[in-house]
From Swiss-Prot:
Transmembrane segments: none
Gene3D superfamilies according to UniProt: YggU-like
InterPro entries, alphabetized: DUF167, YggU-like_sf
Family, similarity comment: Belongs to the UPF0235 family.
Name of encoding gene: yggU
This protein's name: UPF0235 protein YggU
Organism: Escherichia coli O127:H6 (strain E2348/69 / EPEC)
HAMAP family associated with the record: UPF0235
Any one cellular-component term (Gene Ontology): cytoplasm
Pfam family, one: DUF167
Species classification: Bacteria, Pseudomonadati, Pseudomonadota, Gammaproteobacteria, Enterobacterales
Signal peptide range: none
Length: 96
């Protein structure tokens, strides 16, 4: 399975998360996943909520349209973005 998949109702992203980074960013490919650096620590779900907020801004969707499908407690996550309004250039490059 590739890092980014398009299906009927949106995008499915396979992510590798780097918590406690100096800034939020979509870094690029990390093996067969997209590496995302976020500033939040991996404590009490802070990293997950920060990730959902960050991805919501990147894809211009509400936080409720960013769904963590797999990997709630780990660095390797599968996230669904429902009906993205915009696709960040780092992700668009992986779709080609």
């Amino acid at each position: 399975m590739s890092a980014v998949t398009i299906n009927d109702d949106g995008l499915v992203l396979r992510l590798y998360i780097q918590p406690k980074a100096s800034r939020d960013s979509i870094v690029g490919l990390h093996g067969d996943e997209v590496k995302v650096a976020i500033t939040a620590p991996p404590v009490d779900g802070q990293a997950n909520s920060h990730l959902v907020k960050f991805l919501g801004k990147q894809f211009r969707v509400a936080k409720s349209q960013v769904v963590i499908e797999k990997g709630e407690l780990g660095r390797h996550k599968q996230i669904k973005i429902i009906n993205p309004q915009q696709i960040p250039p780092e992700i668009a490059a992986l779709l080609n």
